[in-house]
């Protein structure tokens, strides 16, 4: 019997941490199961995956690709050229690497790579993170072997026979966050036993959330609440002056497990990764959907929870006036905290990564027969 060749897998996508970290979680789970597997990432040149993926121990190729700007921009004139150039480079990558499967996790690079893989006869799989599918994934769904989703009723967008309900991949240290509870407050320079609000706006930051907190810091201090405030890299320099004994300001948090462990209430954008992590840790949260995303998918993500009393939602336009007031209200209301915590846990899928990897190898092994 001939020796089976190592599995060769391409994972494509990125642009934000919300796409990159789930992709790395999938890669890590594949490596844990089959250590000799060869994994290649394909991302967008100049985006954060070009640093984060090598830091996680994987090789990555970059495509000259970006999204269409909503405002009139010279960059938009180059978009068709970028798509064509990226497609042909993706074809070359696929033909050289010869993958058993190509996985798209969303982000600019996902579309040309999966199109190239489909055209080359390579099996493909989409991991759709949001409750509202984007244009690219809807177009790709016609040819992929499977679509791993995190929300119900995705038959609105995809062929029902291809949908696999897996949940979104989350890093193992987040799933095991309770192990990091001891010493979590002191890790961030905060005091145990004091009501703690954790504010996060994603790796790049959220202007409206930051403005809302900045305007109302005195109210939070006067209420006896301490704050861990993750500003994002674009806003940190202008906000670091507020760092104090009870307000800890940071641009980025690597130890999200500890941040979740010590938080009583969390304020967050409503990206798919954030919601998946919040569901697993089961902490009461207030979601402020970003209005600057395709198809307004963050609002749809947030509504999926708020309609089930699994989160509170504050519209971005209302956040400067309402967000901190809502946070103070929730910090004082133990019954509301309990209800939100109980309901958001029903959305948790701690085994999502393993479910996705199971489907990946089911497809590969079927094709290898």
From Swiss-Prot:
- The answer to whether keyword Cell division applies is yes
Q: Record's InterPro entries? A: GlcNAc_MurG (IPR006009), Glyco_trans_28_C (IPR007235), GlycoTrans_28_N (IPR004276)
Question: What is the enzyme's class at the highest EC level?
Answer: transferase
Listed pathway(s): Cell wall biogenesis; peptidoglycan biosynthesis
Which membrane topology describes this protein?
Answer: Peripheral membrane protein
Q: Which UniProt keywords apply?
A: Cell cycle, Cell division, Cell inner membrane, Cell membrane, Cell shape, Cell wall biogenesis/degradation, Glycosyltransferase, Membrane, Peptidoglycan synthesis, Transferase
Subcellular localization, per the record? Cell inner membrane
Among the GO molecular function terms of this UniProt record, one is: undecaprenyldiphospho-muramoylpentapeptide beta-N-acetylglucosaminyltransferase activity
Q: What is this protein called?
A: UDP-N-acetylglucosamine--N-acetylmuramyl-(pentapeptide) pyrophosphoryl-undecaprenol N-acetylglucosamine transferase
Q: What is the protein's species of origin?
A: Cytophaga hutchinsonii (strain ATCC 33406 / DSM 1761 / CIP 103989 / NBRC 15051 / NCIMB 9469 / D465)
Gene name of the record? murG
């Amino acid at each position: 019997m001939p020796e089976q060749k190592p599995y060769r897998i391409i994972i494509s996508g990125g642009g934000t941490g919300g796409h990159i970290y789930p992709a790395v979680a999938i890669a890590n789970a594949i490596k844990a199961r089959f250590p000799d597997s060869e994994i290649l990432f394909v991302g967008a040149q100049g985006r954060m995956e070009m640093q984060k993926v090598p830091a996680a121990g994987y090789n990555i190729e970059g495509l000259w690709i970006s999204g269409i700007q909503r405002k009139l921009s010279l960059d938009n004139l180059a978009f068709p050229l970028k798509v064509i150039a990226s497609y042909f480079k993706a074809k070359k990558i696929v033909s050289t690497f010869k993958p058993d499967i190509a996985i798209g996790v969303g982000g600019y690079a996902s579309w040309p790579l999966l199109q190239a893989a489909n055209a080359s006869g390579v099996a493909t799989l989409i991991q759709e993170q949001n409750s509202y599918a984007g244009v690219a994934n809807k177009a790709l769904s016609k040819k992929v072997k499977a679509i791993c989703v995190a929300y119900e009723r995705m038959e609105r967008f995809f062929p029902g026979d291809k949908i696999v309900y897996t949940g979104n991949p989350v890093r193992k240290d987040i799933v095991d966050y309770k192990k990091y509870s001891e010493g979590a407050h002191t890790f961030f320079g905060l005091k145990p036993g004091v009501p703690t609000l954790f504010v996060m706006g994603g790796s790049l930051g959220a202007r409206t959330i930051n403005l809302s907190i900045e305007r109302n810091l005195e109210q939070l201090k006067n209420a006896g609440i301490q704050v861990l405030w993750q500003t994002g890299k674009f806003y940190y320099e202008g906000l670091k002056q507020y760092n104090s004994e009870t307000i800890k300001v940071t641009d980025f948090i690597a130890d999200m497990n500890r941040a979740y462990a010590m938080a009583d209430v969390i304020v967050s954008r409503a990206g798919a990764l954030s919601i998946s992590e919040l569901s697993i840790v089961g902490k009461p949260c207030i979601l402020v959907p970003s209005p600057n995303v395709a198809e307004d998918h963050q609002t749809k993500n947030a509504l999926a929870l708020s309609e089930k009393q699994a989160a509170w939602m504050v519209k971005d336009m209302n956040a400067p006036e309402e967000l901190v007031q809502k946070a103070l209200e929730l910090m004082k209301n133990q019954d509301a905290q309990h209800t939100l915590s109980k309901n958001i846990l029903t959305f948790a899928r701690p085994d999502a990564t393993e479910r996705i990897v199971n489907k990946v190898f089911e497809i590969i092994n079927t094709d290898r027969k």
